[in-house]
């Protein structure tokens, strides 16, 4: 349960209630899928892991929309190449009426997604929580579709960077407070300071030097200092990845005297996210092309400023969650 959802905590002196919420609406990135019949089982026992529960009797009730096992299909992949061994990979399937997930094997990336309703799906390979490959696949009743071996070509982390802060994986976990944001409110006294001071490339570390979240009214300007050699004074591209944003928050970049244009806001959930325990939204990468004439040999100063046409106070001001940022030669 997300922090702040106190209205969901209900109890009296004589009874306790369990509320199982399937569709909550916080951080919702896709239209609500309706008319989906799924089986959910709540088991009360001594605390040990329950065994398989037979729910096949649901198929005898004549429920509208029920699709039995024999009318479903599967997708299997022989493997996934181009993976980063530091991360787990997941394969997701989605269309307007259904959604499925399958874990990729840690050794070679093979996977199987069974019990799928027939149809055409968008299939995405996720590096942790960042989509790094997208394609379509068709599922047929009573059959298994082969996706072959998938070669990942869309991982931004595969690019050689002059420097990189964080990991391109769709999560802020490696940054300051990144491991706490799903269980604590940003104002919690157990949180480290959201304003850590300048980040110095080559000296600072993401875990202690760069915040997971940035808000317009909390830590509205973050500074990164980095050195360049003469051979590195070429057109460079700054890439800034965010995982979600609130109230149109997005980063604007300044490098030395060069100031970027205001980027457009990303498409994100309309609800609160950063203050209700989720960093998950629509992963978005902002790119800023820096002219070589604006760079200097020695120390350069990058300032990231949280901007938005909206306003708010403190943690309810426009903001966003970081995925990673890096500097690469302009392609």
Language model regions located:
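Short, acidic Ser/Thr/Gly-rich low-complexity loop/linker segments typical of extracellular
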Residues: 95-110
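Compositionally biased low-complexity segments at domain edges in trafficked proteins
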Residues: 149-203
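A short, solvent-exposed beta-strand micro-motif common in secreted/extracellular proteins
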Residues: 109, 119-129, 306
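Beta-strand-rich ligand-recognition modules
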Residues: 219, 227-233, 241-330
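Structured interaction patches on ligand/partner-binding surfaces of diverse proteins
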Residues: 129-148, 152-155
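A short, amphipathic beta-strand motif
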Residues: 73-83, 109-111, 148-150
């Amino acid at each position: 349960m997300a922090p702040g959802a106190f209205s969901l905590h209900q109890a009296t002196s004589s009874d306790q209630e369990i509320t199982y919420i399937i569709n909550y609406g916080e951080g919702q990135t896709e239209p609500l899928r309706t008319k989906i019949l799924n089986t959910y089982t709540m088991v009360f026992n001594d605390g040990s892991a329950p065994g398989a529960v037979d729910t096949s009797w649901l198929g005898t009730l004549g429920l509208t929309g029920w699709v039995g096992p024999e009318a479903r299909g599967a997708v299997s992949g022989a493997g996934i190449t181009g993976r980063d061994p530091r991360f787990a990979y997941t394969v997701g399937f989605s269309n307007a009426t259904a959604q499925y997930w399958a874990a990729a094997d840690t050794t070679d990336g093979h996977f199987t997604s069974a019990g799928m309703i027939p149809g055409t799906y968008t299939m995405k390979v996720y590096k942790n929580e960042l989509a790094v490959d997208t394609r379509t696949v068709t599922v047929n009743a009573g059959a298994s579709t082969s996706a072959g071996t998938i070669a990942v070509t869309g991982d931004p982390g595969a690019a050689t960077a002059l420097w990189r802060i964080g990991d391109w994986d769709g999560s802020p976990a490696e940054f300051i407070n990144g491991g706490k944001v799903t269980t604590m409110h940003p104002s919690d006294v157990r949180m480290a300071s959201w304003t850590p001071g300048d980040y110095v490339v080559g000296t600072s570390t993401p875990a202690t030097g760069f915040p997971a979240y940035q808000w317009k009214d909390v830590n509205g300007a973050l500074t990164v200092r980095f050195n360049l050699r003469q051979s590195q004074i070429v057109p460079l591209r700054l890439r800034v990845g965010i995982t979600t944003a609130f109230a149109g928050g997005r980063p604007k970049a300044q490098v030395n005297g060069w100031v970027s244009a205001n980027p457009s806001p990303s498409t994100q959930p309309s609800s609160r996210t950063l203050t209700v325990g989720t960093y998950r939204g629509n992963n978005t990468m902002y790119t800023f092309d820096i002219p070589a004439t604006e760079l200097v040999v020695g120390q350069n100063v990058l300032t990231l400023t949280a901007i938005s046409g909206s306003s708010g106070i403190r943690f309810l001001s426009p903001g966003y969650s970081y995925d990673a940022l890096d500097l690469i030669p302009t392609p």
